[in-house]
Amino acid sequence: MMTQANAYFYDGADVALLNGQYTDVFSLLGMHSANEGKALIVRCFLRNAISVDVISIKDGRKVASLDKVNEQGLFAGTLGRRVKPFLYLLRVEYPLCQLDIVDPYQFDSLLNSDDIYLFGEGSAERAYEFLGANWRQTQGVEGVHFCVWAPNAKRVSVVGDFNHWDDTRHVMRQHLANGLWELFLPNVVEGAHYKFDLVYQNGERHTKSDPMATQMECAPHNASIVPPKAHHSWNDTAWMSKRAATAWHKAPMSAYEVHLGSWRRKGEQGEQYLDYQDLIEQLIPYVKEQGFTHIELMPISEFPFDGSWGYQPVGLYAPTHRFGDANGLKAFVDACHQAGIGIILDWVSAHFPKDPHGLVRFDGTCLYEHEDPRKGTHPDWDTLIYNYDRGEVRSFLLSNACYWLREFHFDGLRLDAVSSMLYLDYSREPGQWLPNAYGGRENLEAISFLQILNQRLYQAFPGICMIAEESTAFAGVTKPTDQQGLGFGFKWNMGWMNDSLSYLGRDPLYRQFHHHQLTFSLMYAYTEQFMLSVSHDEVVHGKGSLLHKIPGDDWQKFATLRAYYGFMWGHPGKKLLFMGCEFGQRNEWNHNQSLDWHLLAYEPHQGVQRWLKDLNHLYQAMPALSVQDYEGAGFSWLDCENSRDSIFTFVRYGLAGDAPLVFVINMTPQLHTGFRIGLPLAGDYREYLNSDSQIYGGSNQGNAGTVVAESLPWQGMAQSALITVPPLGCLVIGPATGLAEAN
C-alpha cells in the first residue's frame, strides 16, 4: 500500500513536505488535475488523522476516501470520474473526534495586483486590508486571509491555536516577485492566537508576531490574535463634518496630554487600569468641564514594557490590551467626538525596539531597518531606525497612519522624535554616521517620507492636525510641501518651553536678569505654526513637577504657576498641558500610579484647577486668542522691557469686530498700584480674569473687576489707565462688552 500511495507524490516531495522544506506547497497540496486532465487528485497533510474523506460542499456528498500515504499524516487519492475542480471539505477522523475541515489549499490567491503595486511603490494607504489577518469570503466560504511580507525567507508558515502550532501544517503561498506570503484559512475562529514561523536562508527558524496584527497578547506573551468580525457603529457624523470645515490654525486648540495608564486607576490599591468605558464616564466629562478642546493620548500601539510609556511599540497596528479592545477604543473616540472633544494620537515612526518577536531582522535580513548601524540604530534608545527609502516600509508606515485616522477616527497625529528622523548625525559623534548623497547631514529619505505622509493624510482626512515634536531650528516644519516644507500643521515650540521653564525656576529676585527668557520667543513666533507644549517629558526623570520647579513658599509656588499659565494662554500658539499640571501635582509623574487626585481636597490645588478651567473657557470664547495666532497683527507688546519689575504687558487682537485683550503678568511678589498701561480702545474695560483672585487662592489684589480708559497716550496707545497689578499675578483685561459679544 505504501508503495502505491507514494505514487501520488513527486520524487521526494513527501519527505520534503514533512521536513518543512517544500516551499511551493500549493503545487502539491490541494486539488490538482492528473492523468493529462482526465482525473482529479487531492493531497493533504493532517497529523494524527486516522482517515480522510473528500466531501463536496455543494451537496454534502462524499466523493472519495483518501489513501494514507504514511504515518506522519500525508493522505492522497483520486476522485473517481470527476475532472472539473469543485469546492470540498475534508472529513477527518481522529482518535477522539471527527472534524470537517475546508482545505485551504484549494483556493487561489486573494491578492490584488493594484494593492501589490502600491505596496511596493511605497504609496499604499490601506495595506492593513490585505496584510496581516483579515476576515474574507471567497466562493461563499468565510475565513481569515493571512498575509505577510518576508521576501528573503525560505519558507513561511502560519502557526496558531488552530493547528497546534505545527509549522509544517499551514505553509503559505509564496509570491517571488514581491516577497509576499499568503494563506486563506476557513477553519479559524475569532480570538485565535497565531504567529508567522519563518525559515531563514541559513536554515534558522524564528517565530514572529504579525507586523500588521490588530490585536496582541499581553506581555510576557506576544502572540498575535485574530480580530473579531464585529465593527463599531459610529455616531460622530456631526463632529467629522465640523472638523472638516475647521481651520485649526485659526481656532482655539487646547490639548490635554494623557497617559491612560496613570491618569486615574481603580482597585483597592490602585492596581487596575481604567477601561475604555471607565474613561468615557470619567475622563471625557472632566476634560469637557476643564475646557480643553482636545485630548492627546500618549502612544497606545501595543508595547510590552510599561516603562517605555508606549514609545517602544512592537504592535504598531494593535491597540494595547491594557484598556480594552479595538471596539472599546473606537467607542471612546466616538464619545469624545459626541462631547465636542478632538483626540490626537501620539505616533512613533522614528524608531522601533529590538524585541526578537518584532520587526528586527524579520525575515533573516534587515528588512524594516538599515543594515549599517550608522543609519539603522539609535544610540540613545538602543532601538532601530526604519529604512525610509524602501517602498514597502513607507507603505507600512503610511498605512499605519491612515489606519488610526480612518478606522479609529483620530483627529490627527503627533509625531515623536522628529528631529531624530531629520538628521543623520542625530546624537552621533563624528565617524558614527553616514552623510547623504550630497555630503550633508540631512536624512533625505526621512524628509521625503514626512512630506509624502503629511501631504497624503491632509488630503485624505479633512480637518486633521499633524503635529511635530521637533527640537531644532530645521526650517519649514509647518511650511507646505509644495514650498519645500515638511507639511506639518503644528510644531511643538521646544525653545519657548525650555526658556520659560528655566525662567520659572529662578528666584523672583533674579528674574529681572533673565527677562529675555519670556520675551525671546516672540522674535520667532511666526516662523512656524507653533504649539506651546508643557508635556510629560518636563515632569519626569528627576525634573520634578511644575510646582516643584518653582522657588519660594507654597503661596509663591501656586501664584507663580497661575501667572505662568496666564502667560502661556496669552502667548500666540496652540496649547498643550500634561495631565496633573492643571491642578498643581506636587510629585513628578510616575507611570505606575494614579495622579494625586487627593490634592484637590486642598484649596490651593482647587484654585489652580479653577484658573485653568477659566483660562480655557475664555480662550474658546474670545477669538482674539486664536484667530490670528500666526499673524503678526494678532499680537503687540505694550512693554517687553520692564525687566526691573519683571512685568510683561501685551495685547492680543482678533479680526475686525473682535474684542482685543490686554495681558499683564507680574512675575515677582511685589504689588504695584497706580501702574499705567496702554489700552487699544477707549471706554470701559473689565477684568475678565485675575489669577490673584481669592477664588483661585490669591491675595485678592486687583481692580474690583473694572478699568476705565482715559485719553492719555501711553505705550504707543491713544488711551491708558492706572491699574493695580497683583503680586505674582496675571490680569486679562478687555472691553466691557467684549465677552458678551463673543458669546
From Swiss-Prot:
Keywords: Carbohydrate metabolism, Glycogen biosynthesis, Glycogen metabolism, Glycosyltransferase, Transferase. It is an enzyme of class 2 (transferase). The keyword Transcription regulation does not apply. The active site is at 416 (nucleophile), 469 (proton donor). InterPro entries: A-amylase/branching_C, Branching_enzy, GlgB, GlgB_N, GlgB_N_E_set_prok, Glyco_hydro_13_cat_dom, Glyco_hydro_13_N, Glyco_hydro_b. The keyword rRNA-binding does not apply. Pathway: Glycan biosynthesis; glycogen biosynthesis. GO terms for cellular component: cytosol. Transmembrane segments: none annotated. GO terms for molecular function: 1,4-alpha-glucan branching enzyme activity; cation binding; hydrolase activity, hydrolyzing O-glycosyl compounds. One of its GO terms (biological process) is glycogen biosynthetic process. Its EC number is 2.4.1.18. Pfam families: Alpha-amylase, Alpha-amylase_C, CBM_48, GlgB_N. It comes from the Bacteria. It catalyses: Transfers a segment of a (1->4)-alpha-D-glucan chain to a primary hydroxy group in a similar glucan chain. Monomer. Catalyzes the formation of the alpha-1,6-glucosidic linkages in glycogen by scission of a 1,4-alpha-linked oligosaccharide from growing alpha-1,4-glucan chains and the subsequent attachment of the oligosaccharide to the alpha-1,6 position. Belongs to the glycosyl hydrolase 13 family. GlgB subfamily. This is 1,4-alpha-glucan branching enzyme GlgB.
